């Protein structure tokens, strides 16, 4: 079983999550169960840019894939790029989309 966390705190957050979920399915990920979509506050260090303080929409999907975890990770990064995620080396930076494999 594979669990993937999906979230967004920039732009049309709900649409971003729906697009990511559809792309995930297009890449051969079979969704067996999914959580509700819920909102959480951004967690930021005290010195973070105030413009980064935007709430996230999040969800988790449970499913299966014929891909190995490393190949699945490559596909997840491809989806993030397709949805215009800006790669920042600052882990606190807002995101159009993120997809993380949960262990």
Predicted features, each with a name:
Residues 1-103:
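Core catalytic alpha/beta fold that binds nucleotide/phospho-ligands
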């Amino acid at each position: 079983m594979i669990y993937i966390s999906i979230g967004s705190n920039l732009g049309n957050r709900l649409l971003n999550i729906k697009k990511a979920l559809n792309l995930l399915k297009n890449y051969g990920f079979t969704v067996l169960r999914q959580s509700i979509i819920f909102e959480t506050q951004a967690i930021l260090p005290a010195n973070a840019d105030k413009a980064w303080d935007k709430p996230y929409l999040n969800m988790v999907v449970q499913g299966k894939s014929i891909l190995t975890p490393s190949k699945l990770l490559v596909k997840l990064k491809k989806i993030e790029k397709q949805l215009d995620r800006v790669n920042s080396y600052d882990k606190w930076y807002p995101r159009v989309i993120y997809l993380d494999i949960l262990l």
